[in-house]
């Protein structure tokens, strides 16, 4: 096996398992310990993985360092726009909708152009887009509370009390990662607020680009089996198939 094939195999191993020990790579690829260590060092330099004691962990599978709203805003723009265009087709005049935080949901807000809707959100950037479209029949509400600087989403007791009194025909939301049939986020507070909204929504749709599939994060907040559908892109059919074992996928 040449070096480039070996690097490719190690990348596949660590991304599939999340983390892998050096001796496992030695056995799987039938190469020396020293060769594996050199390969891991090279892959770490390329940003593919992070070396840990006795092995390495995937930089694709772990998402514990949360990116800011601005950082996320510049990533996978076309994929998010593709997802948003599919999501807007699920919205009907007369719906009462909850929109969660996230840049993919923000793209959906840009696409919404209906005559008669009631939209509630706890995300300031989403609200700022929609409030410009408000009319007598197109009503937009922002739930207040404590704002998280990273995501510009309102959370906490005040937000949750307001949310607990409301009911929605549809909810559109995103997550930082999806793994083992669970949607995950970096904040317990955001997770709890999302759970309340989910429990008060008749139809529930998760919007995620395929880079998030297989990624772990700090707090899980819903099972994919509880959702009506997951909307994603077509960049990685293998990842999409993983989701299809739990829920309908729209792409």
From Swiss-Prot:
DNA-binding as UniProt keyword: yes
Function as written in the Swiss-Prot or TrEMBL entry: Repressor of the lactose catabolism operon. Galactose-6-phosphate is the inducer.
Disulfide bonds: none
GO terms assigned for molecular function: DNA binding; DNA-binding transcription factor activity
Keywords in alphabetical order: DNA-binding, Lactose metabolism, Repressor, Transcription, Transcription regulation
PANTHER family on file: GLYCEROL-3-PHOSPHATE REGULON REPRESSOR (PTHR30363:SF4), HTH-TYPE TRANSCRIPTIONAL REGULATOR SRLR-RELATED (PTHR30363)
DNA bind region: 20-39
Pfam family, one: DeoRC
Protein's organism: Staphylococcus epidermidis (strain ATCC 35984 / DSM 28319 / BCRC 17069 / CCUG 31568 / BM 3577 / RP62A)
UniProt protein name: Lactose phosphotransferase system repressor
């Amino acid at each position: 096996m040449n070096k480039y094939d070996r690097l490719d195999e190690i990348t596949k191993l660590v991304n599939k398992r999340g983390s892998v020990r050096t001796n496992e790579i030695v056995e799987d690829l039938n190469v020396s310990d020293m060769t594996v260590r050199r390969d891991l060092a090279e892959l770490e330099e390329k940003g593919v993985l992070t070396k840990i004691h006795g092995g390495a962990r995937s930089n694709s599978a772990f998402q514990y360092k949360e990116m800011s709203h601005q950082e996320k805003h510049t990533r996978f723009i076309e994929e998010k726009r593709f997802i948003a265009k599919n999501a807007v087709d699920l919205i009907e005049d007369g719906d009462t909708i909850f929109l969660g935080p996230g840049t993919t949901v923000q793209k959906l807000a840009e696409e919404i152009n209906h005559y008669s809707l009631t939209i509630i959100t706890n995300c300031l950037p989403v609200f700022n887009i929609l409030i410009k479209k408000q009319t007598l029949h197109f009503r937009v509400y922002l739930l207040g509370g404590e704002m998280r600087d990273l995501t510009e989403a309102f959370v906490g007791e005040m937000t949750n009390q307001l949310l607990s009194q409301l009911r929605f025909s549809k909810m559109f939301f995103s997550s930082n990662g999806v793994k083992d049939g669970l949607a995950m986020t970096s904040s317990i507070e955001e997770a709890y607020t999302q759970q309340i909204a989910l429990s008060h929504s008749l139809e529930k749709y998760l919007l995620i680009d395929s880079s998030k599939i297989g990624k772990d994060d700090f707090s899980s907040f819903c099972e994919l089996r509880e959702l009506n559908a997951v909307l994603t892109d077509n960049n990685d059919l293998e990842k999409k198939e993983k989701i299809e074992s739990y829920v309908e996928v729209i792409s």
